Curated annotation (Swiss-Prot):
Record flagged with keyword Cytoplasm: yes
Classification via CDD domains: RNAP_L (cd06927)
Protein name (record): DNA-directed RNA polymerase subunit Rpo11
Subunit structure comment from the entry: Part of the RNA polymerase complex.
GO molecular function, one term: protein dimerization activity
Catalytic activity: RNA(n) + a ribonucleoside 5'-triphosphate = RNA(n+1) + diphosphate
Species for this entry: Methanococcus maripaludis (strain C6 / ATCC BAA-1332)
Classification of source organism: Archaea, Methanobacteriati, Methanobacteriota, Methanomada group, Methanococci
Gene: rpo11
EC number of the protein: 2.7.7.6
Family: Belongs to the archaeal Rpo11/eukaryotic RPB11/RPC19 RNA polymerase subunit family.
Length: 96
């Protein structure tokens, strides 16, 4: 089973779904995307979540939407944002 499903993709738009997740990662990705040059829209939505009896967490399949201007490739910006998140985590690990 995939963790990420690409629902729609063009040069300037991408919509993806994170399987069995909550607001945490989706909100972080959205915030980092909004800081990137060329991003017109970065948003996410969560359908009504369900309680996972094994973890006690409310989970859903959040959908992340990214729209960029005509000069900016949406997939490239998304990959840059994800790399920035990984870099931040690595920096934090080194400082602990």
């Amino acid at each position: 089973m995939n963790y990420v499903n690409i629902l729609e993709k063009s040069k300037n738009f991408i919509e993806l779904e994170l399987v069995n997740d909550d607001h945490s990662l989706s909100n972080l990705i959205k915030e980092v995307l909004l800081s990137k040059k060329g991003v017109i829209l970065a948003s996410y939505g969560v359908e009504h979540p369900v309680l996972d009896p094994d973890t006690g967490r409310y989970i859903s399949n959040p959908r992340i939407m990214l729209k960029t201007d005509a000069k900016t490739d949406a997939e490239k910006v998304l990959k840059e944002a994800l790399k920035d998140i990984v870099d931040l985590c690595n920096k934090t690990l080194k400082e602990l």
